[in-house]
Curated annotation (Swiss-Prot):
Listed cofactors: [4Fe-4S] cluster; [2Fe-2S] cluster
Pfam families: BATS, Radical_SAM
Gene that specifies this protein: bioB
Free-text remark on how the cofactor is bound: Binds 1 [4Fe-4S] cluster. The cluster is coordinated with 3 cysteines and an exchangeable S-adenosyl-L-methionine.
Domain (Radical SAM core) ranges: 45-274
Species in which this protein is naturally found: Beijerinckia indica subsp. indica (strain ATCC 9039 / DSM 1715 / NCIMB 8712)
SUPFAM superfamilies for this protein: Radical SAM enzymes
Name of this protein: Biotin synthase
Classification of source organism: Bacteria, Pseudomonadati, Pseudomonadota, Alphaproteobacteria, Hyphomicrobiales
């Protein structure tokens, strides 16, 4: 065996070397270990369904290489949508709840939160989602401590702010903001006691070492992020990463299993790219430790598995 068996308690001092040893395990051994740890910390039959809505689409000032919403992407065909009204957002949230989602996530395409009418509307949305009996999550870019405090007071459950990749590879993906700025936002959110939703994207041209470095940073947070989205790049024509090849599904499985081992108490969310996976590949991801998915036909601006496909997946997991 190439790595020690992972047991409780939860650790926050994982080295890159230790995580790399886990990542490099033979796949069946890696999945077996991750599945065992998953069962120690979670009900294996518990699969959270979250729903994600773009409440403001396109026109973003940033240049994230994977994203279709940048205002710098003249070659991308995207219908811009200005800020949705709270009533329209809450109608979508209610429908998501009726479709089985218990968390509703709202994303706005901008660099950072700015105080004013738009942010006030977001606060109203958060309050409304909580009143529906759902968890509320937002992804709004960078923010400061006082804005995090207002979100907390509105009842926000979690704030999504992905680190995407390693600090070393990040400048090859984004140039309009820094990794340290991302970390500062996470610190502001943590300072108000809001749960972190923080993960990354694989398939952007990064190395295994970059993936390991990302996991080491996430696993170094105390507490660990409440949820860790593992996204597979969805190449969008016209973006700098639009010509990337489709990721091998087993790379997604390996990333999820390693994340489960080093963050045993977090929800690991099988996120973007899921629509390209077969039903069997998705189930293998769940065996390896994924216990949350996004439900709905679209994730912000990229395709997601259909509701009918997800219904068939749920039936396969737990026949009625």
């Amino acid at each position: 065996m190439n790595a020690p068996f992972v047991v409780s308690p939860v650790r926050h001092d994982w080295s890159r070397h230790e995580i790399k040893a886990l990542y490099d395990l033979p796949l069946l051994e890696l999945i077996a270990r991750a599945s065992q740890i998953h069962a120690l910390y979670h009900d294996p039959n518990d699969l959270q369904k979250a729903s994600l809505l773009s409440i403001k689409t396109g026109g973003c000032s940033e240049d994230c290489g994977y994203c279709s919403q940048s205002a710098r992407r003249d070659e991308v065909h995207l219908d811009r949508v200005e800020m949705m009204s709270p009533s329209d957002v809450l109608a979508v949230a209610a429908q998501a709840r009726d479709n089985g989602a218990d968390r509703f996530c709202m994303g706005a395409a901008w660099r950072q939160v700015r105080d004013g009418a738009a942010f006030d509307a977001v606060l109203e949305m958060v309050e409304g989602v909580r009143a529906l009996g759902m968890e509320a999550c937002v992804t709004l870019g960078m923010l400061n401590q006082s804005q995090a405090q207002r979100l907390k007071q509105a009842g926000l459950t979690a704030y999504n702010h992905n680190l995407d990749t390693s600090p070393e590879f990040y400048p090859q993906i984004v140039t309009t903001h820094t990794y340290d700025e991302r970390l500062a936002t996470l610190e502001a959110v943590r300072g108000e006691g809001i749960a972190l939703c923080c993960g990354g994207i694989i398939g952007m041209g990064e190395t295994v070492e970059d993936r390991v470095a990302l996991l080491a940073i996430l696993a170094g947070f105390d507490p660990h992020p409440e949820s860790v989205p593992i996204n597979a790049l969805v190449p969008v024509a016209g973006t700098p990463l639009g010509d990337r090849q489709k990721l091998d599904p087993l790379e997604i499985v390996r990333m999820i299993a390693t994340a489960r081992l080093v963050m045993p108490d977090s929800r690991i969310r099988l996120s973007a790219g899921r629509s390209s996976l077969s039903r069997e590949a998705q189930i293998l991801c769940m065996v390896a430790g994924a216990n949350s998915i996004f439900s709905g036909n679209v994730l912000l601006t990229t395709p997601n598995a259909s509701l009918d496909a997800d219904e068939a997946l749920m039936e396969a997991l737990a026949p009625r």
